[in-house]
Amino acid sequence: MIDEPVLTVNEITAGYTPGVDVVRSCSLVVGQGEYVGIIGPNGAGKSTLLKAIFGLVRVREGSVQLRGETVTNLPAHELVARRVGFVPQVENIFPSLTVEENLRIGIYQRRRQWDERLAFVAGMFPVLASRFRQRAGLLSGGERQMLAIGRALMSEPSVLLLDEPSAGLSPLNQELVFERTAEINKSGISIVMVEQNAQRCLEIAHRGYVLDQGRNAYTGPAGELLHDPKVVELYLGSLARKQ
C-alpha cells in the first residue's frame, strides 16, 4: 500500500471518438519517487491512458488526482504548472532552434530557475551539455529524444510521463535512454513510462501495470510480472489474434 500517492487514476474511461472507449475503467497509483511501467500488446490503450492523465484525451468517467487534488481534464499547461511533465511518442523538438533554445521553451513560468534547471539537465544528459549552441536538427535520434526528455525536466516536474521513449531508436540509444530515465528517477522524480519493450521496462520499473484491450489486466511488483506466465500468455495471445 502506498501511503501518500503523488498520482492517482481512479477507474477512468476515455477515448478519441464519442461513444468509442479506448481506455475502460483503468486505475493507477504512483508513489512519490516511484518508477511505474505500463506494458501491454499493441492497441491496449497504453498511450491513450497517458494522454488522458495529461489532459490530451477527454476523460468521460472516473478521475485523476495529483497529491489529492482532482485534476481530471485540466489543460496540459495547467498540469505542467502543477509539476507534471510529459514526453510524447511523436518527436516534438524544434529542429531549427538550438538545443539551448529548445530547453528554454520548457522552463515555463520558472524563468529565475534557468541556471539551476539547465545544470540539472546537463548533469542528466552530458551528451547535450557540449551542444547547447548546436541546432537540434543536427542531433542523432537518441540525442533528440534526450533533448525532449530534458525539456520536460526544465519545468521541475515531480511526475514525469514518458510515452514509449525508446520508439524508433537503435538498441544502443534505447539503452542510453533507459539508463537516463533510471537516473532521473533516482533524483526523486516519479516516472510513469509506457513502453513496448516489456522486458526492459519491467527490469527498470518498481511496479508494473499490464493493459489489455483498454483495461487493467495485471498489476504488481515489476520483477514478478516479468516472469508471470499469465503476462507471457497475454502477449502470445495477442500475437495469435493478429494472425
Where are these regions (language model features)?
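The feature captures the beta-strand-to-loop junction immediately N-terminal to the Walker
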Residues: 39-41
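Helix-to-loop junction immediately C-terminal to a conserved catalytic motif
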Residues: 54
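Conserved ABC transporter NBD signature motif
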Residues: 62-71, 82, 114-123, 220
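ABC ATPase signature
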Residues: 97, 139, 152-153
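Conserved ABC ATPase signature
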Residues: 135-139, 143
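A short, proline-enriched helix->beta-strand linker immediately N-terminal to the Walker B motif
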Residues: 154-158
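Catalytic Walker B motif of ABC-type/P-loop ATPase nucleotide-binding domains
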Residues: 160-164
